[in-house]
Amino acid sequence: MPLVNSKKMFDAAYKGGYAIGAFNVNNMEIVQGITEACKEEKAPVILQVSKGARAYANHTYLVKLVEAAVHECPEVPIVLHLDHGPDFETCKACIDGGFTSVMIDGSALPYEKNIEVTKKVVEYAHKYGVTVEGELGTLAGIEDEVSHAVGSYTRPEEVQDFVSHTGVDSLAIAIGTSHGAYKFKPDQCTRNEKGILCPPPLRFDILEEVSKRLPNFPIVLHGASSVPQDYVAMINEFGGKLSLIHISEPTRQAEIS
């Protein structure tokens, strides 16, 4: 099976009530470990590459590693995805270089500018059968050069307009998760009755409202590696219907432990 884009994968995930794992990769060991696990579990997977990984490992090497995984695990549907593409040029380079899915992260831009750059990427990507993930709202934290001191929640009233004007295939939203190993600074937290610092609460109400406004549409959650399992159950309860969950930090921690 050759590399695939995410469209059919997301459709199956939404109908089946499960989410696809998207794992950041930057070397042979991580690619091997993830794809072999997916082979055992008979699970589809998205292997994603950040801007930092492209700089560290070289675009061509990473593409060839993933192509090797496709060859070794032909029964596993694999998407090669750009994570947090910062601009049109980076997305275009990945599309031209063999990626089957890209994310354009215009979340820090003014709303209209985000629409403009996202639409430009979508129009180019769709010519080549490449799927596109957009983003509304920003996550706090630092991970692979994606840095925001303060996060901003997604505004549900914007999601329908954004999707209709850009033509994106999936949408990443911000409900209070955070990038990186060190999720929140003390001044971003509150203290409970025992004086223990507690991170900002996850905004399940936003997730619920977005799901109502975008029925049958793939919703993506970044910064999800530290979300407790009981919260995952709550996400489903509130109609999350998440089609994609991004995981980065645990794979790096596992590699060095």
Task: Tell where the protein language model's regions lie, with residue ranges.
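N-terminal amphipathic alpha-helix/helix-capping segment at the start of soluble metabolic enzymes
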Residues: M1-G21
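Alpha/beta enzyme core
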Residues: S6-F10, M28-Q48, G52, Y61-C73, ...
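Histidine-centered catalytic micro-motifs
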Residues: G21-N27, L80-G85, P218-Y231
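Acidic-and-aromatic substrate-binding clefts and catalytic sites of carbohydrate-active enzymes
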Residues: A55
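A glycine-rich helix N-cap at a beta->alpha junction
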Residues: E72-L80
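Glycine/small-residue-rich hydrophobic helix-like segments
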Residues: G195, D205-L244, S248
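Single conserved hydrophobic/aromatic residue that forms the stacking wall/gate
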Residues: I245-S257
